């Protein structure tokens, strides 16, 4: 990628668009977790409906993703989280947990 061409510009970095439930099902499969853990809740006001990133401008400079959804990228991510529990376990308590309890408790009832 030519950095001279890219200087001062904004680029989106992404891969192929996937439905949220496709990602959820794959994570459940990779972790061996039960699909019964999935709970559908009412959307909160302003909740994002989708995440779609167009990286064609960046691809025009020669950038290509190193991983894809189907070629091991998600597996590597799940493995990283398994190996770095000390990084994410603290978010299950304290202010972060209180925030999610406030946002979702009524919708999960």
Where are these regions (language model features)?
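C-terminal substrate-binding subdomain of Rossmann-fold SDR/epimerase-dehydratase oxidoreductases
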Residues: 1-109
